[in-house]
Amino acid sequence: MSDLENKIATDIESYLKEHENKQLLRFITCGSVDDGKSTLIGRLLHDSKMIFEDQLAAIKKDSKKVGTTEGEFDLALLVDGLQSEREQGITIDVAYRYFTTDKRKFIIADTPGHEQYTRNMATGASTADLAIILIDARYGVQTQTRRHSFITKLLGIKHIVVAVNKMDLVDFKEDIFNQISSDYLKFAQELGMTKDITLIPISALNGDNIVKRSEKSPWYKGDTLMNLLETIKIDEDRDLVHFRFPVQYVNRPNLNFRGFCGTIASGVIKVGDAITVLPSGKSSTVKEIVTYDGNLDYAYSQQAITLTLNDEIDISRGDIIVKSDEQPDHASNLDVDIVWMSEEPLIKGKQYFIKRATTVTVGSIDHFYYKTDVNTLEQSEANVLNLNEISRAKLDLEQVIAFDSYDKNKVMGSFIIIDRITNNTVGAGMIRNKSEDQSKKDSIYSDFEIEFNALVRKHFPHWECKEIF
């Protein structure tokens, strides 16, 4: 049995207790096709002894059929789970894997390198604390490297590790690593990525500088990849100042209890704090902070809690509870960045459901400011947005919502776009700011026309009738 299987088999309770309080780091791997992303994750899983023996046996068997390495087994097959991925030797879907060390827990998202799977990479990056961008030492910074760096910046990932892989194929030459480092840092500066970028020379296939320092690169004085992942500071990434609490569920098991359930998006709340409910603007104070393990005196970002208040206020799912002295901005017209994920193009004026945290409303694109070519990063005019394209646009909502910019608060500043007919998620967006023009145009329609329009939109949504004012 493997070390992991032995621990679980002998004392599962102590194993779970040992790991439950460790800090969690979510990270993604991205880079050009065949840069070794899946192999790197396989190496991390293998060297951290997080593979069951039956998994290892299956991988060894599959390696003989579809393996791409000359070794005993292909580490990439630990991650490439889809049959089409194994046959093509590429990653298509976002593959999530979990492992743990003595210091920290990890969730890895292995994202596709191909341009046609940009939406998949955006999905994997949306919850990541850190991104590992792989560069093949033989080829240096490539078009896909630039694309993935742009997406990590777009999605607000604060910590970047550039892993220069396959250094064994260039004999771990220091000058090659230094040249790639210089090229990438120059590009990152042009992109506005100036904080927390670390470069590491590695060989994912052989394990050099992954968990143990390699003797082949005595000139490299920095941390190994694993040591960096275990020690990088992510606590300060959380906003513990501005309290935001999207109400997910109103819990009323009996006449004597009415609690508001959800997960704190940011900030800290204490019993007795003055709060305001948005969009109604009604105020109260916190009576109790209830959890499964008992009541708390205070709670903070990412904790799931139930709040009770000292006053009877009408609150429902989708409302936002904030501290009265720390209120967010509010608007119905927003400047947003959109990643389009549907084969049906995004058209100006077409109405979609817009879901931000627990708030759901209806909205449409008023106009596109520009779209960005993810390969050249050039901006151009746009009338529609096609699959995998990214655009800055003006989003018009049917109701005013409270929001923070995505850069300040990912939960309050992100949303998904849902097709009103199929209920498919067709896009994702990041709120950058409120639009300069918040006024509604003077109506050119009669009261009857406006009421009839509302009736048609309510009972015949498949007609995709646009709202008039």
Swiss-Prot record:
Please list the reactions this protein catalyses.
sulfate + ATP + H(+) = adenosine 5'-phosphosulfate + diphosphate
**What is the top EC class of this enzyme, as a single word?**
transferase
Has the keyword Ribosomal protein been applied to this entry? no
The protein's matches in PROSITE patterns, at most eight in alphabetical order, are given as: G_TR_1, G_TR_2
Which EC number(s) does UniProt give? 2.7.7.4
Query: InterPro entries of this UniProt entry?
Result: CysN_GTP-bd, CysN_II, CysN_NoDQ_III, G_TR_CS, GTP-eEF1A_C, P-loop_NTPase, Small_GTP-bd, SO4_adenylTrfase_lsu
Q: Where in this protein does the record put region G2? A: 89-93
The record's keywords, sorted A to Z, are: ATP-binding, GTP-binding, Nucleotide-binding, Nucleotidyltransferase, Transferase
> PANTHER family given for it?
TRANSLATION FACTOR
Q: What is this protein called?
A: Sulfate adenylyltransferase subunit 1
> What is the species listed in this Swiss-Prot or TrEMBL entry?
Aliarcobacter butzleri (strain RM4018)
Q: What is the lineage of its organism?
A: Bacteria, Pseudomonadati, Campylobacterota, Epsilonproteobacteria, Campylobacterales
